Amino acid sequence: MTRDQVTQLVLDSKRRKQLKWAQLAEATGQSKEWTAAALLGQMTLSAAQAGAVGRLLDLPADAVDGLQVVPYKGSLPTAVPTDPLIYRFYELINVYGTSIKELIHEEFGDGIMSAIDFSMDISREADPKGDRVRIVLNGKFLPYRMY
């Protein structure tokens, strides 16, 4: 079973059982953000985590096994995204990416922000003009070294 097929089974069962990512996160013992990334095919689950999710979602054994395979990360299509929400992140990086890069370099020096030693938090922020999406990206700074 391919990772894409496993992901589709996860999404179908999640919808059918009317589960939230936070409920699935309880089964993995990780954050809802990490769990969503894992179950959408971007992270590897341990045998215990995959088993717990498999029981919760009634996944077949080959799907549970598939959740434990190291995925090809960043395997989304390379074309400009067409989904409106994902496109806004693409647009955000196009507009603010160079500013973010400059500000990180000014503060930390020449290097990158890790997406491996990384955490993310997504929450709702009440606002009288309409609720806001709050996203915190927290990655370790990794300086380039000279050799």
From Swiss-Prot:
GO BP term (any one): cyanate metabolic process
Enzyme Commission number(s) from the entry: 4.2.1.104
Catalytic reaction annotation: cyanate + hydrogencarbonate + 3 H(+) = NH4(+) + 2 CO2
Keywords: Lyase
Major enzyme class: lyase
Pfam family, one: CYNS_N
Active site per UniProt: 88, 91, 114
GO MF, any single term: DNA binding
CDD domains: Cyanase_C
Keyword Lyase in record: yes
Function: Catalyzes the reaction of cyanate with bicarbonate to produce ammonia and carbon dioxide.
PANTHER family hit by this protein: CYANATE HYDRATASE
Assigned protein family: Belongs to the cyanase family.
Name this polypeptide is given: Cyanate hydratase
Taxonomic lineage of the native organism: Bacteria, Pseudomonadati, Pseudomonadota, Betaproteobacteria, Nitrosomonadales
